[in-house]
Curated annotation (Swiss-Prot):
It holds the Pfam family UDPGT. Induction: Induced by exposition to gamma ray. GO terms for biological process: detoxification. It is an enzyme of class 2 (transferase). It comes from Oryza sativa subsp. japonica. The keyword Glycosyltransferase applies. This is UDP-glycosyltransferase 79. The gene is UGT79.
Length: 466
């Protein structure tokens, strides 16, 4: 049966359950920040995740309670135990649906009925369980509107697999997308579904039954994706509620103490902030490619040499499970100008005055963090939504450039060096900075009192407060 911690919040409003995809940092943190906003409006947020995650990760603290469900692997990481994603998802559904139903029942019997379940639509079974228990549901989409709507169009059979650049041009011509997507820009899960069939199915199935949800929420803001957000709202009733980041970085005085996500699957004690303090303003390249993507030895070698050859000081995040791939020679070369760490407080680093550029995989959370801090990007996408986001960064938002692979699909150090120099020293460096600053202001306005996303959050909270 699902278990519950001691209450952390003092609000007397209705209980909101938050169910992100288990052990996915990029899905959990935005939902937690949304929960903090709901707590400000008087609701009582409860984080629901797997027993294994709760046993290995410190709880987020006030204003959250925590509740546990099972993915069938209470004593081990499910994704590690079942590396086949399709098999893990089936196991997660079987155990998760049962224990979520038990949790909803036990909470109701204890006099704490859930008013609404905010869930990740990568877990569509959660909607069915909640509705069977008489609990309202709100789907929380954690990717940009541009990518979401492509998945939605496939689910609605208005687009067929594989999705082609011609299909994307049709969306652009209709005014649905703000930029024309080429062969390297269409989300790869639907552009080449045969390569990752489980992820393709999971992405599309987010939209199956979405019309049955009471609310649909998107972690974006209308000024960033005006055409896409408008289409999402007219087609799926989706409301933008982002960027869902700690309010300290949004200059929102209503939640002054909200300075961190508060739920970290990765930890580090490396003093990178002290190192940053010693660097000149806007001189440092932050390099991080997320918590999921992996590089082979050759790619790391090219990336590292490109960084060193750029002549810029750099902070390079190489996860501990990737560190062994770095050669001794490359480590010594990096020591001259850079600092290699297994983890860094990314938001803090991006907000630091020394940071001048972010070389990123362009996952959605990392991109929003760069936008909120006005930091130009060098995009080096890997999969999922990243190629599409990279296209928007370079061609529509004008806040950076994209690293191009050679004709054989190989990363070359010269290209890494070229892109860093272009953003940091090139003729358009002031354009990149100006565009990043413009979007930063728009992002903050959307989340400050009376902004577009803030209004949507307030309306959602009011709906479930009575």
């Amino acid at each position: 049966m699902g278990s519950m911690s001691t209450p952390a919040a003092s609000a007397n409003g209705g209980q909101v359950l938050l169910l992100p995809f288990p052990a996915a940092q990029g899905h959990t943190n935005p939902m937690l920040q949304f929960g903090r906003r709901l707590a400000y409006h008087g609701l009582r947020p409860t984080l629901v995740t797997t027993r294994y995650v709760l046993s290995t990760t410190p709880p987020p603290g006030d204003p959250f309670r925590v509740a546990a469900i099972s993915d069938g692997f209470d004593d081990a990481s499910g994704m590690a135990a079942l590396p086949d994603p399709g098999e893990y998802l089936r196991t997660l559904e079987a155990h998760g649906a049962r224990t979520l139903a038990e949790l909803l029942l036990s909470e109701a019997r204890a006099g704490r009925p859930a008013r609404v379940l905010v869930y990740d639509p990568h877990l569509p079974w959660a909607r069915r369980v909640a509705r069977a228990a008489g609990v309202a549901t709100a789907a929380f989409l954690s990717q940009p509107c541009a990518v979401d709507l492509i998945y939605g169009e496939v689910c609605a059979r208005r687009l067929a697999l594989p999705v082609t650049p011609t299909d994307a041009r049709g969306l652009y011509a209709r005014g649905v997308l703000g930029v024309e997507l080429g062969p390297d820009d269409v989300p790869p899960f639907v552009a080449a579904p045969e390569l990752t069939p489980a992820f393709c199915e999971q992405s599309i199935e987010q939209f199956a039954g979405l019309e049955d949800d009471d609310d649909v929420l998107v972690n974006s803001f209308s000024d960033l994706e005006p055409k896409e957000a408008a289409y999402m709202e007219s087609t799926w009733r989706a409301k933008t509620i982002g960027p869902s980041l700690p309010s300290f970085y949004l200059d929102d005085g209503r939640l002054r103490s909200n300075t961190a996500y508060g739920f970290n699957l990765f930890r580090s004690t490396v003093p990178c902030m002290e190192w940053l303090d010693k660097q000149p303003p806007r001189s440092v390249v932050l390099v991080s490619y997320g918590t999921v993507s992996t590089f082979d030895v050759a790619k790391l070698e090219e990336l590292g040499n490109g960084l060193c050859n750029s002549g810029k000081p750099f902070l390079w995040v190489v996860r501990s499970n990737e560190e062994h791939k770095l050669s001794v020679q490359l480590r010594k070369k990096c020591e001259k100008r850079g600092l290699i760490v297994p983890f860094c407080p990314q938001l803090e680093v991006l907000a630091h005055k020394a940071t001048g550029c972010f070389l990123s995989h362009c996952g959605w959370n990392s991109t929003l963090e760069a936008i909120v801090n006005g930091v130009p990007l060098v995009a080096m996408p890997h999969w999922a939504d990243q190629p599409t986001i990279s296209k928007y960064v370079e061609s529509l938002w004008g806040m950076g450039v994209r690293v191009q692979l050679d004709k054989s699909g190989i990363l070359q150090r010269e290209e890494v060096e070229r892109c860093i120099r272009e953003v940091m020293d090139g003729d358009r460096k002031e354009d990149y900075r100006r565009n990043a600053t413009r979007l930063m202001k728009k992002a903050k306005e959307s989340m400050q009192e009376g902004g577009s996303s803030d209004k949507n959050i307030a309306e959602f909270a009011a709906k479930y407060s009575n």
